[in-house]
């Protein structure tokens, strides 16, 4: 224990030494604080060393602190603006310095993005190296190498747009510089980003706001393509503050009018945009910077040329115009001359590269017309897990194929898409098909342009395309973005040679396949059974039959489309029809409603030559026209009628048109040869009736039709009719013949006098009875008063007497209505309750008047009442 104490003593000494050291340190700190306090005594000493002193102790004045805080906030607010301005300056300087030369194609720059790194030796501790790209942006292959804003680049990376496609590499260097472009590229090559990026960057560099109005307009041929462009714009420009609007048909115009003036970017169809230019108040495009025409060839094909010209006239001339198309035709070049200023012609097609994707395998399937649907059903049945698009020539064919194949139930989901559908149903079908991993879409050429259907494996063209451009757009729905794809085009034997020649001119690689008809699944019998059960399907089959033949007849390329070689009867049987429908071609105009296209074209040529003063027509042309007209079976009678308008002259080579004298109605009637065709006035009446039938679709109709068949309603209606007939027609009443009237026609005076005498006697008796009743009532009242005075009262037996009073027939009681009633109703019953004896009935009236009423002492039984009633009745009968 002592040892332990000895060990503890030096520890205490050490603790004391430590405490002394701490005290010395604290003293030193207090001395330093004193010196600081002495230093800050001068409050307004600006030369003081602020870094070594606390700011709160120096600037203890609150006003100075607030001023410094405001300055810091202003600097922080200015930082993003200054950064944005610096970024805009650097991008603009780079665009000026590295702009490609006019007439060059940046796609020719083979050099990849190479960069040299330079190290900065400002300090020895800096180990990082800054990279400076010395390559020009026209040679860029990634979006990050382009002179674009960080907001756009961030959205591109999030949307997984990293590499530039060929059309983007070729067009973006020129469009970012503000040049006009006429670009041509194959479908699925990324043309949408080629004009969306310049729109966003141009408005961003100009610091565009809502008050600046409309800065860019994108015109699309179809609504679906406009919606698709709008979706890409939302994805790429989501970090920008621009307002964008979708202006298409099928939507509420008034809502668009209310919001269109607050938009910066408009994506529209030509018709709806022109409508807003004409109708919307305050619609102003004077500040427009960029105009984009996407799928310009399709816009012109749909007949929007006049609409485009009027739109371009309302836009400012100082603008940037971008025109993109899959094909460049003469009409597009004419449009480019009108709307573009010094354009750059950019095409990504090489001499050895066709306009179709490289990963696309093309097949031509030659088969008869009546085996088309069997071929299609067999193919769908064997490709249930693949995504297929099937193209038809008309809307009626799409509807018929979709309805019948649904009944056949091939085992996959089927979708229809055509121009007769409403806008939002088309949009729903488009979105549903895009989400599906497997399915079949029956569509017209409305789905052939610009629409991006993801992961489409097969494209089947049941009907031959109109031209090679339509073929390119159809097969372009597959093999997009370097993905593999396959296409099958079903051709007739008469269409094979012409289509093969067109594809060989474009240097396309394809295979020709002739399937065995015996191995195909036949659906003719099933279709005929469906049509026999459902009249709607039969109507659709007839319409699809007629629409297909009309589409073939109206084609301009007669080398491919030969209507004379079609087996119409077998084709109608393949659709399930028992007979071939009657067809009448040529309803192009009102003047030639019942004439073929050949005759109407001749009349147009005659009118044109009349206006120019040329009346001569070559006879050779007429002979050719006659041969073509004779080939069409249903137009023989019509053509014979039309030939009467032309008269032969002495010259064999030429024919002259001479004016005919007007004919009377009778002459026209006898000269008429085709009795099945109605006159123009009757056709107008038919169109009016059809319009009225269409209008009646929207009329509200009564639904409770079963009420008309109820028996109750019929009975009530009969009663009402009977009453009305009885009231309105009194002449129909028949009276019964009276037998009392003598044959001489004199009135029965003796009978009338007899009746009068009987009535007078009855009146005397009634008066006597009335007097007796009054007397009895008075006597009864007097007897009651006497009893009260004498102290007696009515016994309970008297009050409870059950009496009966019988009024003679035809006699009315004067007290029924309450007249002369007393307060006590029970007393009245006692007065009238009296016995009638047989002796009283034999007495005269005088003896009855002398008799006085006797009080009732006995209680009357039911037998007594019956006897009194019988006596009373016998007396009245006498």
From Swiss-Prot:
Q: Which GO terms describe its biological process?
A: rRNA processing
| EC code | 3.6.4.13
Keyword 4Fe-4S recorded: no
What are the Low complexity biased-composition ranges? 16-30, 113-123
Give disulfide pairs as residue numbers: none
Biased composition regions of type Basic and acidic residues, renumbered to the chain? 1-15, 31-53, 608-618, 665-674, 860-869
Q: Which reaction does it catalyse?
A: ATP + H2O = ADP + phosphate + H(+)
* Ranges spanned by the short sequence motif DEAD box, renumbered to the chain: 294-297
Q: Where is the composition biased (Polar residues)?
A: 102-112
- Please indicate the residue ranges that the annotation assigns to the motif Q motif: 141-169
Q: Which domain of life is it from?
A: Eukaryota
| Span of the signal peptide | none
Where found?
A: Nucleus, Nucleolus
Which UniProt keywords are listed?
Answer: ATP-binding, Helicase, Hydrolase, Nucleotide-binding, Nucleus, Ribosome biogenesis, RNA-binding, rRNA processing
Annotated positions binding ATP: 161-163, 168, 185-192
Question: Which intervals hold domain Helicase C-terminal?
Answer: 372-521
InterPro entries cross-referenced by the UniProt entry? DEAD/DEAH_box_helicase_dom (IPR011545), Helicase_ATP-bd (IPR014001), Helicase_C-like (IPR001650), P-loop_NTPase (IPR027417), RNA-helicase_DEAD-box_CS (IPR000629), RNA_helicase_DEAD_Q_motif (IPR014014), SPB4-like_CTE (IPR025313)
Among PROSITE patterns, the record links this protein to: DEAD_ATP_HELICASE, HELICASE_ATP_BIND_1, HELICASE_CTER, Q_MOTIF
Summarize the protein's role: Probable ATP-dependent RNA helicase which may be involved in ribosome biogenesis.
Q: Entry's PANTHER family?
A: RNA HELICASE (PTHR24031)
For this chain, the family text in UniProt reads:
Belongs to the DEAD box helicase family. DDX10/DBP4 subfamily.
Entry protein name: Probable ATP-dependent RNA helicase ddx10
What species was this sequence derived from?
A: Dictyostelium discoideum
**Taxonomic lineage of the native organism:** Eukaryota, Amoebozoa, Evosea, Eumycetozoa, Dictyostelia
Q: Which gene encodes it?
A: ddx10
């Amino acid at each position: 224990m002592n040892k332990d104490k000895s060990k503890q003593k030096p520890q205490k000494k050490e603790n004391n030494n430590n405490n002394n050291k701490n005290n010395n340190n604290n003293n030193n700190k207090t001395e330093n604080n004193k010196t600081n306090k002495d230093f800050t005594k001068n409050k307004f000493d600006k030369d003081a060393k602020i870094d070594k002193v606390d700011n709160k102790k120096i600037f203890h004045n609150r006003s100075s602190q607030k001023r410094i805080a405001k300055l810091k906030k202003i600097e922080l607010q200015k930082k993003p603006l200054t950064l944005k301005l610096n970024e805009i300056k650097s991008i603009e300087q780079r665009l000026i310095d590295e702009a490609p030369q006019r007439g060059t194609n940046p796609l020719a720059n083979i050099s990849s993005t190479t960069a040299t790194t330079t190290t900065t030796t400002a300090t020895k501790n800096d180990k990082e190296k800054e990279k400076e790209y010395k390559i020009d942006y026209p040679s860029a292959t990634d979006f990050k190498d382009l002179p674009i804003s960080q907001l756009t680049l961030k959205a591109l990376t999030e949307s997984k747009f990293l590499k530039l496609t060929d059309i983007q590499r070729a067009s973006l260097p020129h469009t970012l510089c503000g040049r006009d472009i006429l670009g041509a590229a194959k479908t699925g090559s990324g043309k949408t980003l080629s004009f969306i990026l310049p729109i966003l960057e141009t408005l961003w560099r100009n610091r565009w706001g809502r008050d600046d109005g409309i800065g860019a307009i994108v015109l699309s041929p179809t609504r679906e393509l406009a919606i698709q462009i709008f979706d890409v714009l939302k994805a790429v420009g989501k970090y920008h503050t621009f307002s964008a609007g979708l202006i298409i048909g099928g939507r509420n115009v008034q809502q668009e009018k209310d919001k269109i003036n607050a938009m910066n970017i408009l994506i529209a169809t030509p018709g709806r945009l022109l409508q807003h230019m004409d109708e919307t108040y305050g619609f102003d495009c004077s500040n427009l910077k960029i105009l984009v025409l996407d799928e310009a060839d399709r816009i012109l094909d749909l007949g929007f040329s006049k609409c485009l010209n009027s739109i371009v006239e309302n836009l400012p001339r100082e603008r940037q115009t971008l025109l993109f198309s899959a094909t460049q035709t003469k009409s597009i070049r004419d449009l480019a001359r009108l709307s573009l200023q010094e354009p750059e012609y950019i095409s990504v097609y090489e001499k050895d590269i066709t306009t179709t994707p490289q990963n696309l395998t093309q097949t031509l399937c030659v088969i008869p017309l009546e085996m088309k649907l069997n071929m299609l059903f067999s193919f769908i049945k064997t490709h249930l897990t693949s995504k297929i698009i099937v193209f038809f020539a008309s809307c009626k064919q799409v509807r018929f194929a979709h309805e019948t194949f649904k009944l056949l139930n091939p085992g996959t989901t089927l979708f229809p898409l055509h121009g007769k559908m409403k806008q939002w149903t088309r949009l729903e079908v488009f979105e549903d098909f895009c989400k599906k991993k497997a399915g079949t879409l029956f569509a017209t050429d409305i789905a052939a342009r610009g629409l991006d259907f993801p992961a489409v494996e097969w494209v089947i063209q049941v009907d031959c395309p109109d031209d090679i451009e339509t073929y390119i757009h159809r097969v372009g729905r597959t093999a997009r973005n370097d993905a593999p794809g396959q296409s099958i085009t079903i051709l007739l034997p008469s269409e094979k040679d012409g289509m093969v020649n067109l594809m060989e001119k474009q240097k396309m690689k394809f295979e020709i396949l002739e399937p065995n008809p015996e191995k195909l699944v036949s659906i003719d019998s099933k279709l005929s059974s469906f049509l026999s059960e459902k009249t709607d399907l039969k109507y659709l089959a007839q319409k699809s039959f007629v629409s297909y033949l009309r589409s073939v007849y109206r084609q301009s390329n007669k080398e491919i489309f030969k209507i004379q070689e079609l087996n119409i009867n077998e084709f109608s049987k393949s659709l399930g029809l028992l007979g071939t429908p009657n067809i009448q071609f040529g309803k192009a105009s009102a003047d030639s409603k019942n004439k073929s296209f050949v005759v109407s074209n001749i009349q147009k040529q005659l009118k044109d030559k009349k206006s120019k003063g040329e009346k001569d027509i070559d006879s050779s042309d007429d002979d050719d026209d006659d041969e073509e007209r004779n080939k069409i079976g249903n137009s023989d009678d019509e053509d014979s009628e039309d030939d009467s308008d032309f008269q032969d002259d002495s010259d064999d080579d030429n024919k002259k048109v001479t004016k005919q004298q007007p004919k009377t109605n009778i002459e026209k009637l006898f000269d008429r040869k085709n009795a099945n065709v109605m006159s123009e006035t009757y056709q107008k009446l038919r169109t009016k009736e059809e319009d009225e039938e269409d209008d009646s679709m929207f009329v509200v109709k009564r639904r409770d039709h079963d009420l008309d068949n109820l028996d109750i309603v019929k009975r009530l209606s009969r009663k009402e009719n009977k009453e009305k007939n009885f009231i309105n027609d009194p002449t129909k009443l028949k009276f019964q013949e009276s037998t009392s009237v003598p044959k001489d026609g004199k009135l029965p005076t003796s009978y009338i006098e007899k009746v009068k005498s009987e009535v007078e006697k009855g009146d005397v008796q009634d008066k006597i009875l009335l007097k007796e009743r009054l007397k009895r009532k008075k006597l009864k009242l007097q007897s009651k008063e006497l009893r009260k005075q004498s102290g007696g009262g009515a016994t309970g037996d008297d009050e409870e007497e059950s009496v009966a009073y019988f009024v003679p027939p035809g006699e009315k009681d004067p007290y029924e209505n309450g007249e002369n009633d007393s307060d006590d109703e029970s007393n009245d019953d006692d007065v009238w309750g009296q016995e009638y004896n047989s002796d009283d009935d034999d007495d005269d009236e005088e003896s009855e008047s002398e008799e006085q009423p006797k009080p009732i002492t006995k209680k009357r039984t039911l037998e007594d009442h019956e006897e009194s009633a019988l006596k009373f009745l016998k007396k009245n009968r006498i």
